[in-house]
Structures are given as C-alpha cells and as structure tokens.
UniProtKB/Swiss-Prot annotation:
PPR repeats lie at residues 146-180, 182-216, 217-247, 251-285, 286-320, 321-355, 356-390, 391-425, 426-460, 461-495, 498-532, 534-568. Belongs to the PPR family. P subfamily. It comes from Arabidopsis thaliana. PROSITE patterns: PPR (PS51375). This is Putative pentatricopeptide repeat-containing protein At5g65820.
C-alpha cells in the first residue's frame, strides 16, 4: 500500500475538506448509477476524445488547453452569418438539388478558406447535407477544395459508412487535384475503417496507396496498428505486426500501441509479452508504457500490482505524472472505492504532481455515482480556482446526476454557471436537459431548449431527435413528435437504427386514433427515400395498423409490400389471415395468400412450412405476452 501522508495542511482546500469529513465515506453499495457506462475507457471516456490529443501517436491521451470556439476563434463572427445562411438553405432544399443550387448561388455566400469546413461541421450528423454543400462548392468559379476540406468530407462519408463514396472521392482527387493527396488522407480512412470494425478493409488501405502514388511508410503503418488497438482489434494488430516486421522496421511506437491494446482488453499476460519483445528489440519502456500498464492493472482490479508498479517506476527513475495517478483514481471510482481514490489524490499532491482536468473529472464522476452531488460542486469550484477549465464530461457527470434525481432547475442553473465562465453547453448537455424536461412534462421548456440549441449554432443529431420525439410522444404531443420525426427524415438522419423510434411513434399515434397522421409519417419515409425500406420497417407499420384495429389498411400495405418484392414474415402472414378470417374477408385473404404462395415458390420454400412457422411464432408470442402480464399482476398484488 502507498505510504499516504496524514499531514493535511500541505494540500488543496478540496482535499482537506473531503478527508476531514469522515461521514462522507458512506457504504458504497448504497449507490448505483449509470456512470459505469462512462468509465469503459482506460484513460478517459470517449466523450472526451475531441478535447485531448494523442501522445506519441498511441492510445494514451493528454489534455490540451480548452478554448471556446465562439469566444476564442476570431473567425467566428466572420463566418457565422454565412454558415447559418448556408445551413438553412441546405435544410430547406437538400432533397431538390436544382432548387438547392439555385438558392445557394443567389445566397451571396462568399466561399473562402475555413468556411466550407465550418458549414460541414454545422451539418453535424446530417452528412448528406454536408455532401450537397461540398458538391455545390466544387462547381463554383475561382474556388478549389483544400486538403482540409477533403479530409473533413472523408470523415463525414466514413461516419455514414459510405466507404465506396470515400474511395470515389479520393479517385476524383487523383484525377483533378493529385497534388492534394497526402498520406494523412489514408490515415483518416484507416482510422474510420478500424472504428467501424472493418479490419480487413483497414489493412487493404496499405495495398491501395500505391495506386495513388504513395508507398505506405512506418508512420502510416503505425497509425494502422494504433487504430486497430484503440478500437479493440488488438489480436489482428498483433498478427499484422508479426507479418509486417520485415517490411516495416520495429520502433517503440509499435510496441506501445500493442501494449495499450492488450491492457485495454485486460489481457495482462499478453501485455507482459509485449514488454519482453520490446526488451529483445532493444527498447526500454517509457512513461507512456508504464501508464498503460497501470491502467491495465487498475481496470482489472489488481490494485496491489498497480501500486507495486508505481513504486517500481520511481526506482527506475520515472516519476509518475498526472496520467499515472488518474488511471488509478478512475479505476477506484468505478468500483466505489472513493476513500482510497481520495488517498491517491492526496499522494499525488504530496509528490507535487498537479492534478489535471481528467483527474478532477474522475473525482466528480465518483462523487456523482456515490450520490454526493454537493461534493462534486466543491471539486468543480476547486479546479476552476486553480485555473483549470472543466471539460464537457465534467459537466456531463453532474448533469446526469441531476437528471437521475429529476432536478430540472438545478440543470438549468448549472447551464447558467457554464455560460458565466464562457463555456457554452454542447449537444450532449442539451440532450440530457431536454430529456429530463420531457420526462417531467415541461414540454415548453424542451422546445425552448431545442430552439436555443439551434440558435447557438449546434446541429441536433440523431440522439437529440430521438430524445425529442420520444419525449413529445410520451407527453401526448403527437403532432409535434411527428413533425420532429419528419424533420429528422428530411435531414437525412433516419436509418435502420431508428426503427425503434418509428415503432413507438406509429403505435402511439394509431392508439390515439390518428390514422392520417400515421400515414403521413410513413409516407414521409417512403417518399423521401430516407432509408432503404426492408422487411422490418414494413412489419412495424403493418403490425401497428393491425394491432390498433386498422385491418383493411394493414392488408393494403401488405399487398404493397409484396409488390415491392418483400415477403412478409411468417407471423405477419399468420396474424393477417387470422384477422381476415374473423372479418369474413375472403377476398383479401385469397389475394394475399396467392401472392405469398408465389413468392415462396420463387424462393424454393415450402409454403406449408412457412404457414406452420407463422402459427407457431404467433402462439409463442401470445404465450409470452400472457406470462408477462401474469407476472405484472403478481407484482401489483
């Protein structure tokens, strides 16, 4: 165990206050919260990645000074008007390209360095809006895309998983602007493939580079290893490392990436083997490697090994830095060992190692998880007094803790405190507060916050739309919920992952006997071409209609579905046949049966087996529903 000091006068006021109040160390099991989800990262939550830079190109993160774009960026006022003007035009006309281009041509927007990136960023998750603007800008006289614009577009298309379009874009660059192609462009692509868990495609980038005039070098290969390790594909990275040792001479960076990858997934034996390989290759571990090992031990619950390693570092001449202590504090906070986390914080100050934003954020998260929000504010005030600007994640921990306690006014007060130190709430903060407002029935406040968010130049993403739609629907504001859903579709944000929201909205609207409104929502999806409709989407729509008593409409849409070459799921067919039998509607039943029989024959399926499977599925679902209702009644007694 570390030799923790008892002398309190040497430490910060926050340490003195917290450690002098023994009553704050309550039994950890009394408190459960969602913050376990936030601590999955070894060094910091992914929510902080945008605010940190990579050290030596590996997985460890280091804090950069925070600068609020609106107050520190001298170009903000210069760009703001044109960015908003372009964004509003894109929202209004993006599905009608001729009108869109005409509106942009007549907008008076002057293309200049930096503006395109700002507009692309303003489009947020609506990548198709950004792509429309990118295409229009390329057609303008006396303008040529810069490498930064191309890189931004590659990131946007990759985030949408439009990798074919990405390669097409790079091919276009090769033909029209070959001088702009640089290795960093392929690094961006490698990172996106890795984040999408497309390991083979990420590796294939190395083979594609020569076609564009570049041979992969040690830097690009190192970025590939780093990306694979960062996103959990460390086994593939280790195999690739062995396969490529003759092609790319080993260096410390490669070993550090592998070490981070194994520690990240808790494979400490493999991590130790990397140390052996490192030593055999003539490299000594540095402070970053030691920090990765500390993180691995701590997150595996092996705190004794972590403390031993900390002492060993000092013996070897490596004085632990803020990152070293922070990974220990994060791991302790994660398992509710807050008293021990505070002792590590004390030890940190005893060795005159200054805590950074990540350290303070770890303490904030722990106290929030522990249910002591008042202590979070003490930590927050202390870090601000020391000149440290809290990060988005720092505020997010406190905001979510308030949400859990349904303290809406406290959320608004915290947002105001953020503004007072010139720190404007981001999308994540707005998501939490809007969700709580809807939950508490404060619909007007939710709408006000939404409008405020857009006025501040923030683009609602998929999560924000889903929160708003679900919240409005739960409060009976069905027209507003439907309007927001259609707006989400219009902005190109609707995809298969939002089918749950579609199902909830359709069922809620139909339950309220608003058939035309439900049809309008469905029509919006089909007419806008927002998402390639599949069997699941049709099933959601048909089941919603049928379950709410609209049998005729359900059958009509089923026939339309079949005509689009989608075969109904067996239980859908069985449900329709059962309903039509009760209604004595033999005409509809015969038409649907004949069409499905033909589809089964085309697919070389047994129609009898198909029918039997449908009846079985329907029976099992009915039984499952009865069991749930029975258990619910028992609990209510």
């Amino acid at each position: 165990m570390l030799p923790f000091t008892r002398e309190m006068h040497r430490f910060s006021p926050i340490v003195e206050f917290l450690l002098s109040k023994r009553q704050i160390f309550l039994h950890y099991s009394q408190f459960k919260s969602r913050f376990d989800l936030i601590h999955r990262s070894f060094h910091v939550s992914r929510a902080l990645e945008d605010n940190f830079r990579r050290s030596n190109g590996i997985g460890l993160v280091c804090l950069e000074k925070s600068h609020n774009d609106r107050t520190k960026n001298s170009k903000y006022d210069e760009f703001a008007s044109d960015v908003e003007k372009s964004y509003r035009i894109l929202r209004k006309f993006h599905s009608r390209v001729p009108k869109l281009e005409l509106a942009l041509n007549e907008s008076g927007v002057e293309l200049r360095p930096g503006l395109i990136e700002r507009v692309l960023n303003r489009c947020g998750d609506a990548g198709n809006l950004g792509y429309r603007f990118f295409v229009w800008a390329a057609k303008q006289p006396r303008y040529c895309h810069s490498i930064e614009v191309y890189k931004s577009m590659v990131k946007i298309l990759s985030k949408m998983r439009q990798f074919g379009a990405v390669w097409g874009l790079i091919e276009e660059m090769r033909k029209e602007n070959p001088q702009l192609i640089e290795p960093e462009l392929f690094v961006v692509l490698v990172q996106r493939f890795a984040s999408a868990d497309m390991v083979k495609k990420a590796i294939e980038v190395l083979d594609e580079m020569p076609k564009f005039g570049f041979e992969p070098d040690e830097y690009v290969f190192g970025c590939l290893l780093d990306a694979l390790c960062k996103h959990g594909s460390v086994k593939d990275a280790a195999k690739l490392f062995e396969d490529m040792r003759m092609r790319f001479p080993v260096n410390l960076r490669y070993f550090t990436s592998l070490l981070y990858g194994w520690c990240r997934v808790g494979k400490m034996m493999e991590a130790k083997y990397v140390l052996v390989q490192m030593n055999e290759a003539g490299f000594e571990p540095d402070i970053v490697d030691y920090t990765n090992l500390l993180s691995g031990y701590a997150n595996a619950g092996k705190m004794a090994d972590a403390y031993d390693l900390l002492r060993d570092m000092r013996r070897r001449g490596f004085e632990p830095n803020a990152n070293c202590y922070t990974v220990l504090i994060q791991a302790l906070c994660k398992v509710d060992r807050m008293e021990e986390a505070m002792k590590v914080f004390v030890e940190m100050e005893r060795y005159e190692c200054e805590a950074d934003v990540v350290t303070y954020t770890a303490l904030v998260s722990g106290f929030c998880k522990w249910g002591k929000i008042d202590k979070c504010y003490i930590v927050l005030d202390d870090m601000i007094k020391k000149g440290l600007m809290p990060s988005e994640l720092t505020y997010m921990h406190i905001m979510v803790a308030h949400e859990k306690k349904e303290s809406f006014e406290e959320c608004l007060e915290l947002m105001e405190k953020m503004r007072q130190i010139e720190y404007h709430p981001d999308i994540g903060i707005y998501n939490v507060v809007i969700r709580l407002a809807c939950k508490l029935g404060e619909v007007k406040e939710a709408v006000r916050l939404w409008n405020e968010m857009e006025e501040n130049g923030l683009s609602p993403g998929v999560d924000t739309f889903v929160i708003m739609i679900n919240g409005l629907a739960s409060q009976g504001c069905l027209l507003e919920a439907s309007d927001h859903f259609k707006e989400m579709v219009t902005r190109g944000l609707f995809s298969v992952s939002q089918y749950g929201t579609l199902k909830l909205l359709l069922n809620t609207v139909l339950k309220d006997k608003k058939l035309e409104m439900a049809k309008d929502v469905w029509s919006c999806i089909t007419s806008k071409g927002a998402c390639e409709l599949n069997v699941l989407s049709w099933t959601i729509w048909i089941h919603a209609l049928f379950s709410k008593g609209y049998e005729k409409e359900a059958c009509s849409y089923c026939i339309e579905m079949i005509e689009m070459d989608f075969m109904p799921q067996p239980d859908t067919f069985a449900k329709l046949m059962k309903g039509l039998k009760k209604l004595y509607n033999r005409e509809f039943a015969g038409e649907i049966t004949e069409k499905v029989r033909n589809m089964a024959a085309e697919r070389e399926m047994s129609f009898k087996m198909y029918k039997r499977r449908g009846v079985q599925d329907l029976t099992e679902k009915a039984k499952s529903k009865q069991d749930r209702e029975g258990k619910k009644k028992q609990r209510s007694r």
